[in-house]
Amino acid sequence: TTYNSNVGGDGVALCSTAHPIDGSTYANTPTTQVDLNEATLLNAQISIRTNFRDQAGLKVFARGKKLILPPALEPVGIRLTKTELRPGTADNDVNAILSTAGGIPEGYMVMDFLTSSFAWYMLTNIAGLAYMNRIPFETDMQVDFVTDNLLTKGYQRFSYNYFNPRAIFGSFPTS
């Protein structure tokens, strides 16, 4: 699957409706998982801006900055983030996605390795996703004495984790 629901340091999955804070919780995923469209993207932008809280329950300055999509949702991402007028209508209303909460300043990115064709994510301006490069990629080679073939090998150790779930908002619809 695209999403690994293993629990993090706060005892819940990375994208959860119940991240614990002092006496309450906050969500970085919709209560009901939703497909990507104009309304759900606007709701995500507003939810990030209004619902993200710190450990004391105080509002933090959080804004969506980049949309992460599987290849199947790239056309939807283009329509939502690249049009000046409201997508999918004959109205000449402005595209609110481009202005709400500062818009999506870094646009979208297509991740070819997401295995769900429907899940989508919004990275925020808050640091919290971690890539730990424990041993950088190294290669070695030698010529096989018997066959005269060139033998090569590569080795690397790394891991991914998170330390602040406010770094991402995600939705995982099944269709």
Could you say what each language-model-derived stretch is?
Residues 1, 50, 54:
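Conserved helix-loop functional segments at active or binding sites
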Residues 1-10:
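Short, glycine/acidic-rich hinge or "gate" loops at secondary-structure transitions
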Residues 15-18, 22-50, 63-66, 72-175:
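Sequence/fold signature of self-assembling virion shell proteins
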Residues 55, 59-64:
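Short gly/pro-enriched beta-turn/loop segments at secondary-structure junctions
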